[in-house]
Amino acid sequence: MPQALERADGSWAWVVLLATMVTQGLTLGFPTCIGIFFTELQWEFQASNSETSWFPSILTAVLHMAGPLCSILVGRFGCRVTVMLGGVLASLGMVASSFSHNLSQLYFTAGFITGLGMCFSFQSSITVLGFYFVRRRVLANALASMGVSLGITLWPLLSRYLLENLGWRGTFLVFGGIFLHCCICGAIIRPVATSVAPETKECPPPPPETPALGCLAACGRTIQRHLAFDILRHNTGYCVYILGVMWSVLGFPLPQVFLVPYAMWHSVDEQQAALLISIIGFSNIFLRPLAGLMAGRPAFASHRKYLFSLALLLNGLTNLVCAASGDFWVLVGYCLAYSVSMSGIGALIFQVLMDIVPMDQFPRALGLFTVLDGLAFLISPPLAGLLLDATNNFSYVFYMSSFFLISAALFMGGSFYALQKKEQGKQAVAADALERDLFLEAKDGPGKQRSPEIMCQSSRQPRPAGVNKHLWGCPASSRTSHEWLLWPKAVLQAKQTALGWNSPT
């Protein structure tokens, strides 16, 4: 008996929204608590800072880089099965990591397997919101983002409590049971009815291929379908954005990994050090939805890329404050300021990508974007660990974070401004060319041949059939002297047409 489909924007959609919030809190909020175990793991395995840093870097990198693989599973099995599969993998990885005898085993279990499972769960839960919510989609995404903030708030406090009572091995075993709640959230996600019925097409049989060539061809088609390498060649803004975000990611995750060890290095109590991460999460509960709603306002549409650069700049400057002092109350003020810039970055990072790339190319652009960001996440913590081993000073880690964030903000802001000026220059040249064409047409008669670029510009607003008039309203056949009195208005309207402005009433 077929299962009944749920209706979009129905009452069950809010239950799915709650499940999505829980899933995001369990998955995206988890990496922020890894810093609490940093010193404990370092002592357990007698490892350097760089070697210990590979654990959070692998976890975060796989969490972002496995996005295209998750998209394939969603297309094949659906969101419900993928969320539940992710919960099983994340749980299996944490349980296995509690029996690790060296860091290599920890990298594979708690790093790779758990990161893969968390990616499957969180990305599938976000995808299903687009089917369950149509009219209230913006509100649903804003509320779902609160789950991340709740996770950032609760994971550090729970981790500190379990670590004191059970040790890191017992804590990771409990975490394995907690991640099984993703399976419950996945079971709540029922199939939803869509307005578009799937089309059945009869495809011709594929040409015969050898098994090796067929596998390589299938992999190539899959990569081409989910990763937008062709957009890099044709969209300069996309290239600038990817380079800028990758450069900023080399510094952005460092405070979340090293803030707790840095506070303990300055003799801050362990409970208070764990509380710092929770302050960031609690502040984001209110700031992140507010930033998301403000970023969606039409008044900010043309300035979103500059606001994103400003948020990165503020994030880098706040890290300088953290590096200057390790006093607890100074760190509390740092966490509050860091939360403001962090919420702006989280609200704008994908919205700016939507502004730069056409929506029909957005899924492929997002796939390449997450993969390249994952590479940066993989490099960032070990690079900071090498710096820490060389200097034995945590302050240099925050100086390093500030350098990457501030330089990325200046690069993106300057590059976007230069691209905007270049585009405005092209539009001005087109307007001047249209002005010259109108002058020649008025002077020499309607039979004069237009230049190709002018024909392209004027084709956007063709002349109505049966009306043979110039842009300023005079009939083409009546070339009297009063045409020249209206010439300034004609030039103004021509420029407005070329630049895409609305004509004055």
Swiss-Prot record:
Lineage: Eukaryota, Metazoa, Chordata, Craniata, Vertebrata
Name of the protein described by the UniProt record: Monocarboxylate transporter 6
Tissue-by-tissue expression: Highly expressed in kidney.
Segments in the Extracellular topological domain: 39-53, 102-110, 159-171, 261-274, 327-329, 389-396
Subcellular location: Cell membrane
Pfam families in the cross-refs: MFS_1
Function of the molecule: Proton-linked monocarboxylate transporter. Catalyzes the rapid transport across the plasma membrane of many monocarboxylates such as lactate, pyruvate, branched-chain oxo acids derived from leucine, valine and isoleucine, and the ketone bodies acetoacetate, beta-hydroxybutyrate and acetate.
Topology within the bilayer: Multi-pass membrane protein
Residue ranges of the TM segments: 18-38, 54-74, 81-101, 111-131, 138-158, 172-192, 240-260, 275-295, 306-326, 330-350, 368-388, 397-417
One CC-aspect GO term: plasma membrane
Keywords assigned: Cell membrane, Membrane, Symport, Transmembrane, Transmembrane helix, Transport
GO biological process entries: monocarboxylic acid transport
Side Cytoplasmic, residues: 1-17, 75-80, 132-137, 193-239, 296-305, 351-367, 418-505
Main location per the UniProt record: membrane
Protein family per UniProt: Belongs to the major facilitator superfamily. Monocarboxylate porter (TC 2.A.1.13) family.
Coiled coil: none
Protein species of origin: Homo sapiens
Disordered: annotated segments: 443-464
A Gene Ontology molecular function term of the record: monocarboxylic acid transmembrane transporter activity
Highest rank taxon of the organism: Eukaryota
InterPro entries, A to Z: MCT (IPR004743), MFS (IPR011701), MFS_dom (IPR020846), MFS_trans_sf (IPR036259), Proton-linked_MCT (IPR050327)
